[in-house]
């Protein structure tokens, strides 16, 4: 097989496995049998192993020597550290680049998506607006290092946020947050962002104890 074809297969397998982890088709803490996954995906052993090794570097898979691969498990510490890091980064960016965020056309586009979620209650629309809003704060900094660091932890954020079932409530909090930004209420927006993220933390931890593991 040519190198370009090998790379395409590896990328496809990586994306498939990543999606299976994030939507919890592969359960938190589940042991991953490479040969079974190879058969399920109809692909050879090597691309699956390579994809799992890549996912391990991103924190979605854990490698235990002489034992095998496991989906990263999530506990209270994992959730608290993830949210704490988000608060540090997102609040800093909202506070220091408030005017740039408030004047962004994308903010109005996101507000439109939030209105759509209110009408349809569709999780997929919420997930898109959620990612766009929080990444908007980070990108507004224009700081390539901050943006890069946030992207590196996004898979961890994604794993946590898919445990949160309160998306209709989160959507309302997003709407209130955007309204405060648009109105120029900087301090109110900062407090709302902190409150929102702490609410996500509390609800995710609560859901953790009802999550059905493998």
Q: What do the predicted segments below correspond to?
A:
Residues 1-96, 209-214:
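Short linear motifs at protein or domain termini
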Residues 3, 190-214:
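C-terminal effector-binding regulatory domain of bacterial HTH transcription factors
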Residues 20, 24, 153-160, 203, ...:
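A short secondary-structure junction motif
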Residues 49-50, 100-103, 167-171, 207-214:
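Juxtamembrane/interface motifs at transmembrane-helix termini
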Residues 75, 83, 150, 161, ...:
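Short, flexible helix/strand-to-coil boundary loops that buttress conserved ligand/catalytic motifs
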Residues 102-166, 172-179, 188-199:
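Conserved amphipathic alpha-helical segments that form helical-bundle/coiled-coil interaction surfaces
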